Structures are given as structure tokens and as C-alpha cells.
Amino acid sequence: MAKKNTTKYQSNKQEKRVAKSLDAKVTVASGALSFQKADVRSEDFLVECKTTSKNYYTLTLKTWEKIESQAVKDGIRMPLMCIDLNNGETSIAIMRQLDFIGLDYDLKAQYLGNPVPEFIDAKSVRVTADFINAPFPQQLEKGQYPCYRRDVKFLPFGTHLVMIPWEDFINISNME
């Protein structure tokens, strides 16, 4: 058992929380075994969890490509990341834009944020909660769920990712 208030402790706590929220299982040895990768496995998703005590996480294209590749090898699961900032104070879901649309998530909520991506001409992007803290000014349509959104697209690679608060991701996932 990891000592309380260590990164390992926070990571274990995050993995258990993510697994529970997805009705999934925590991967043995946190994905270190050759036959089971990533941190959490559900029927639909292969999830890589990252936690930091900072108010940002630097997501590299290499990290994303690794979970994406593992998800395909693992039985055609969708790659998903859960980034915990400030020791879990804020959690952000990151997924491919094509999966986001394929699951109709783009239709199940009203989003604050521009679905036109920020173009990232680098091999990393800083993930922060800044996009979440803006007031939600739009009038909601009946039955729509309000959700903050940030899209990024790595150039010249074309990888388009969508970031939304983890709690919103779970709520939208559970919508009919």
C-alpha cells in the first residue's frame, strides 16, 4: 500500500475512482505487464490515468499515441485519458474527436467552447482547467446538459482530441 499523500497513493486512488465510474477494472500492476496495458479497462475504453499536484499536465503526442496503439491492440477499445490536476481537485477526460462524435457525445450536451480545435504545432500541449472556469452564458435547450469543452489538434499529425471535465464525461456517457 502506498503511503498517503504520495503520487503513488494519489494514482491508486484515481485508478479506483475511474474504474468505479466506468464500471470497469483496474489493470494489474497499473499496465506494467506485457499482456495488459493502461491503468483501467472497461468494455469500451482503455484508460490511461495521470495525476499531478500541479495545476497543469503536459500531454505529449507520444503519450497519446501509446494509449491509442494499446487500445487498438487490446481488442479495439477506445483510448481515453483521465488527467487529475491539483491532486484530483479537477479531473479532465481526453478522447479522440472521432470517438466523441461516434458516441454521439457531441449531440448529448450543449458545449461552451469552440469545437474548432486549437492547432498545436508542437509535440505537446498543456492541459489545464482554465477552459472549465468560464461562466456558462448560453441559454440551454430543453433537455440539454451544459458542458465545457476544449479541442486541440496536433500539426502536422492531425490528431484531434477533445477535453471535457471527467464528471461531465461520465454524466454524458450515462445519458440515453
PLM regions and their residue ranges:
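Catalytic phosphate/metal-binding cores of nucleic-acid and nucleotide-processing enzymes, i.e., regions
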Residues: 1-176
